[in-house]
Amino acid sequence: MSDVKYFEDTEFGLIEAVATIDNGDFGTRTIRFETGQLARQADGAVTTYLDDDTMLLATTTASNQPREGFDFFPLTVDVEERMYAAGRIPGSFFRREGRPSTEAILACRLIDRPLRPTFVKGLRNEVQIVVTVMSMNPEDYYDVVAINGASAATRISGLPVSGAVGGVRMALVVDEKHPEGQWVAFPTHAQHEQSVFEIVVAGRLVERKRGNKTFSDVAVMMVEAGASENVVNRVKDGAPAPTEKIVSDGLEAAKPFIDILCRAQEGLAQRVGNAAKEFPLFPPYTDEVYSAVERKVSKKLASLLTLKAKQERDDATNAYMEEIEAELLPKFEASYSSAAEASKEIRAGYNAVMKAIVRRMILTDHFRIDGRGVTDIRDLAVEVELIPRAHGSSLFERGETQILGVTTLDMLKMEQQIDSLAPGDAKRYMHHYNFPPYSTGETGRVGSPKRREIGHGALAERAVLPVIPSREEFPYAIRQVSEALGSNGSTSMGSVCASTLSLYNAGVPLKAPVAGIAMGLVSGEIDGKTEYVALTDILGAEDAFGDMDFKVAGTADFITALQLDTKLDGIPSKVLSDALEQARDARLTILNTMADVINGPDEMSKFAPRITTVKIPVAKIGELIGPKGKNINALTEETGANISIEDDGTVFISAADGASAEAAIEKINALANPQLPKVGERFLGTVVKTTAFGAFVSLLPGRDGLVHISKLGNGKRVEKVDDVVKVGEKIQVEIADIDNRGKISLVPVVEED
């Protein structure tokens, strides 16, 4: 039974809250929050443990003064992965940690997304949350532990937040005892391998009323989910497919664990007893400004919002905002320290009124600002093979969102090497997402990817990974790049669609095509009843105006990835399940459109490398490589092929043409499955070494013979071997003798007239 216990050590000032997570047949996990020992000068510091081995220190600190000129909340979240946590020295040149790993950046986003909405609106003091991974059991994930630790540190810091946030990772584990699957909280990596779907859920406790009774409930704030890499094969073998119902069940299964984690944090905060601190708040506008703007703009602004083209609509609403600003500025200027301050509030009030108008029209009329119905998808356009020398390329357009997908294939030795606390040391399928400023018609910094780009790339990668063929089926490293050339709503899901098209164009035999769609949800009171309207294929503006956005990617049969963020205090199960079904209908429509252009792998590009495999005995690996790589380097030089050897004896051969590959295969087979040369056999060999007594000639990789100096002169006396042959020279030889130790004596072949 899941439970919370508290411990206090008054002598040392330590306070602990221990939450026990009961996974039934899969045992229990323990989350322990401890404060009072480490980082005492931070506003809030909590050491969080998962069982005994995984340990994270989370701190929350706020600046003393608000930042001037900021019109947003300056919250920063950093995750510091210390390699000593895994008993390792960093592999970098300086042997110390450098820039954060991709896993650390994704953990930062997982923390930021549910915690940011809990802070009071109008806060302008800088707040920094730092999570340091100090000890790491290689079987555990630390990211969800970090969510809880960061929330607990913030909760005891005295900062104005609405409550604690609990985070849990759930895996649908399928084994012989649980053929239908069981949801397991805080799964190990071994359980991850047995699962078909994983879901990270973060939420908080809210008070609800039922009649005269008040009770606590869990409001889901964030979801990040994905299918396992081997889900297609597992489903074929009888495991449950991760359908929309499975996802809904996973959310419900997570709620009891979130409840216990939130209660543990709240209990810790009560026992610490830090008083709430007072911070100046800077609301974006006053009620007076909002009312003045609302009275002036409602009717005309509503008509401007019906313009279908994004640029035309934006230009019209911005011009009208400047007109309203000019009218109202004289009235409010005297109430502010400067005209700029008054102008900023009027603009903020204008945007708030515009948001309210759009939301009201959606709820009452099912109106959308581009004229579509709530379930309609924007016009789709699909094209492949755009980039001449790329191995695969595609262009996917959905309305004004435009994504270019480009696929590059290479040898497995080009897979990404990972030096982080995450499990695994290499990644074969890499998805990189770029979002240049021109995609929204703006200027800005270009260069290294920002956190948002890394997050979007990871989401698209997670969506496509379950359908990537295995190494044995397709022995290539695959790099997929998504270029967001135009953005007006969900470039990440557009990247999923473009990736499927591009991968097929490159000849990658995907297990199934994948598509994605972004959904929105708007809710509000209409005639005393709460109404919910789900929107298919949301625009950028609808994303900003809505209460929830979620992105769903998958095949025709099941979901491969899902991301959800909501501002609501909970979503009725039926509303969520209906929205997921609505997303599935849209996904099927997009998949059909894509299939009309390309529905399977094309022939591989002539510019792509041809990779074949040969299996050799493990005992022959060293012989193939040779001393200091002599043999394999010679093979590469002679054939022009690139050769990579796996520990199990699998040899991957990459060549620009079939002849080079065949030559390499022939030489590798000759060495790996050697048949002793026979007396009388002739070879065109290469002189590899000369000595005072003769020349050594390479017949096959690792197989040399000696032409004695007495045999080199065609019956004439030779003083120096180098006078007749030189290293690197080709020479036709015949095997004259093989002694009982296997040493080969050669004689030159003299062509007869």
UniProtKB/Swiss-Prot annotation:
Every S1 motif domain range: 680-749
Gene3D superfamilies noted in UniProt: GHMP Kinase, N-terminal domain, K Homology domain, type 1, Nucleic acid-binding proteins
One GO cellular component term: cytosol
Keyword Cytoplasm: yes
Essential cofactor(s): Mg(2+)
Keywords: Cytoplasm, Magnesium, Metal-binding, Nucleotidyltransferase, RNA-binding, Transferase
Alphabetized CDD domains for the sequence: KH-I_PNPase (cd02393), RNase_PH_PNPase_2 (cd11364)
Enzyme class: transferase
Major subcellular location class: cytoplasm
Entries under SMART domains matching the protein: KH, S1
InterPro entries: ExoRNase_PH_dom1, ExoRNase_PH_dom2_sf, GPSI/PNP, KH_dom, KH_dom_type_1, KH_dom_type_1_sf, NA-bd_OB-fold, PNPase
Domain KH: 609-668
GO MF annotation list: 3'-5'-RNA exonuclease activity; magnesium ion binding; polyribonucleotide nucleotidyltransferase activity; RNA binding
EC number(s) per entry: 2.7.7.8
Record flagged with keyword RNA-binding: yes
PANTHER family: POLYRIBONUCLEOTIDE NUCLEOTIDYLTRANSFERASE (PTHR11252), POLYRIBONUCLEOTIDE NUCLEOTIDYLTRANSFERASE 1, MITOCHONDRIAL (PTHR11252:SF0)
NCBIfam families hit by this protein: polynuc_phos, pppGpp_PNP, PRK11824.1
Protein name: Polyribonucleotide nucleotidyltransferase
Species for this entry: Corynebacterium glutamicum (strain ATCC 13032 / DSM 20300 / JCM 1318 / BCRC 11384 / CCUG 27702 / LMG 3730 / NBRC 12168 / NCIMB 10025 / NRRL B-2784 / 534)
Organism placement in taxonomy: Bacteria, Bacillati, Actinomycetota, Actinomycetes, Mycobacteriales
